[in-house]
UniProtKB/Swiss-Prot annotation:
InterPro entries with a match to the protein in the record: Nitrogenase_MoFe_mat_NifZ (IPR007415)
Disulphide-bonded residues: none
Naturally occurring in which organism (per UniProt): Rhodobacter capsulatus (Rhodopseudomonas capsulata)
Domain of life: Bacteria
Name the record gives this protein: Probable NifZ protein
Family classification: Belongs to the NifZ family.
GO terms, biological process: nitrogen fixation
Amino acid sequence: MSTDDREIEVYRAPVYRPGDKVIARKQVKNDGTMAGFEIGDIVVKKGDVGYVRDIGVFLSQFYIYAIDFIERGSIVGM
């Protein structure tokens, strides 16, 4: 699949804004990018509540949301 075949998400406004409340739809495991957790550790469980802290861009194509899961004490890029 070429880049031309995929939607460029950043051509439209982000779905979420900083401060928005979000709920995890899936469990998230550490892929090795989160300090303080072993690879494979669960960092977010389905149903956990978090708040959008920041919005970044990945590969000039996709939005990445920094979600602050306050009760877990972790910020996860999703």
